Design a protein with these regions (language model features):
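Divalent metal-dependent hydrolysis catalytic cores, especially in the metallo-beta-lactamase
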Residues: 39, 99-106, 117-141, 168-175, ...
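Metal-dependent nucleic-acid phosphoesterase active-site entry motif
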Residues: 43-47
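Aromatic-lined carbohydrate-binding/catalytic grooves of carbohydrate-active enzymes
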Residues: 139-145, 191-194
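Active-site entrance/lid segments in N-terminal catalytic domains of soluble metabolic enzymes
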Residues: 142, 152-164, 173
Length: 405
């Protein structure tokens, strides 16, 4: 295997240990006494493609199941999956992306449970909300029935093979939004299952969130008391983003753009008034987009209230009642800018920390804990207290931070 050049230290390609990889994170965890309070990661990932042999066994359609299983026999990615151009490992420099196959985990645990537990402890995380990685792009799959079959299989596999065996790992299950009836059935089937703490819509897709076909699903989720989240991603196939010639541009814009589109439709079509008790969360878009969109929508609304007859308040007031994951959190040199953003979104009660680990731009809990303008109570709310209320979690810390030599 060709190795990235490194003149500073020797790189090994035959071993990998999350505790060693994240030893500085563990040092932070000890120094900041994370063991004294709850930390919940509302957005982390695994690479479900490494277990397609298991996942695809859950596909209900015999034709699609056979095609999917035959596709992975020949190596490479599955022939059933759509994919996106991307450079997540930055030319191999993100070594955890390709060395994780050497991670040693306890034999009595599913591999993904073992790997997830190791990095959680290293960071000082008590609970982690786990999402897929390649399947985040299924919303633009050209075959709706394939998305439905693959997502149904993944959800059942996740619930039965992962969530049922590790109480520290939770998830908000993928809703196949391109088929409204299938999305509704997913909520009916999985609400109340062990580890299922809500439901998630992948944001890169071209279905309007205000379509009446989804209203019964929103109502059902509202009745469960669980949150509905929109998980951002990018798509280089989006026509406007095809003008970008570098991954950095597509990534920076795409992760904001799709959630901005869905948020705008959610607000101007009066869904907060229609479902006032539905807890809505926006994941992995950072924070600045929300601050900006609040101002833009308020400015237009005050001149065109007739366009939004269902609204009784300014758009920003509804947005302040929603929840936002922190990562990838912008870090301006002038911290007063970040402080203003926190104030605008009511971060003390509406912001929830997320790592996005193991992706290339992940954040540690210290991005929140070390902010000078936050009081201790606000830090603890953002790092775990608010998420514990959202997900109905025990607030007793259960992490086991490894010792650092």
């Amino acid at each position: 295997m060709d190795m990235p050049v490194n003149e500073v230290r020797e790189l090994r390609w035959d071993e990998y240990d999350s505790h060693q990889h994240l030893k500085n994170a563990s040092k932070q965890a000890h120094d900041r006494k994370y063991n004294e309070f709850l930390i919940v990661d509302v957005d982390a990932h695994h690479y479900e493609n490494e277990h397609y042999g298991e996942v695809f066994q859950y596909i209900e359609s015999p034709v699609i199941r056979r095609n999917a299983l035959e596709g992975i026999k020949r190596g490479g990615r599955s022939s059933m999956m759509n994919s996106e151009v991307g450079y997540q490992d930055t030319g191999g420099r993100m070594t955890r992306h390709w060395l994780r196959k050497h991670e040693k985990v306890p034999a009595d645990k599913h591999r993904d449970v073992g790997i997830t537990n190791k990095w959680m402890d290293a960071m000082g995380v008590d609970y982690s909300c786990l999402f897929p990685t390649p399947m985040l792009f299924l919303g633009t799959h050209p075959q709706v029935e394939v998305e439905v079959q693959l997502v149904n299989a993944y959800n059942r596999w996740l619930v039965e093979r992962i969530l049922a065996h590790e109480p520290r790992i939770i998830s908000m299950l993928y809703l196949h939004f391109n088929d409204p009836e299938a999305a509704y059935k997913t909520v009916k089937e999985f609400a109340g299952k062990k580890g299922v703490k809500g439901f998630m819509i992948t944001s890169p897709r071209y279905k309007p969130v205000h379509d009446n076909a989804y209203m019964k699903t929103y109502r059902l989720i509202e009745e469960t008391g669980m949150p509905l989240s929109f998980h951002a991603a990018y798509s280089w196939n989006e026509q406007s983003l095809q003008l970008q010639n570098r991954f950095i541009g597509v990534h920076a814009l795409g992760f904001m753009w799709f959630n901005m589109v869905h948020m705008t439709n959610w607000i101007v079509n009066g869904l907060p008034e229609r479902f006032p008790k539905l807890k809505v969360m926006w994941i992995e878009s950072g924070l600045t987009w929300a601050y900006s969109l609040m101002q833009r929508l308020d400015h237009s609304y005050l001149m065109r209230t007739s366009d939004c007859p269902a609204l009784k308040r300014k758009p920003s007031e509804y947005m302040r009642e929603m929840y936002y994951s922190s990562q990838p959190m912008e870090m301006p040199e002038d911290k007063s800018i970040l402080e203003a953003t926190f104030k605008m979104i009511k971060a003390d009660t509406q912001l929830v920390w997320s790592s996005d680990y193991p992706h290339w731009d992940f954040d540690l809990p210290s991005v929140i804990y070390d902010l000078p303008f936050l009081k201790e109570e606000a830090k603890r709310n953002i790092l775990g207290g608010t998420a514990a209320k959202l997900f109905n979690l025990d607030t007793t810390p259960v992490k086991k931070i490894p010792a650092v030599g």
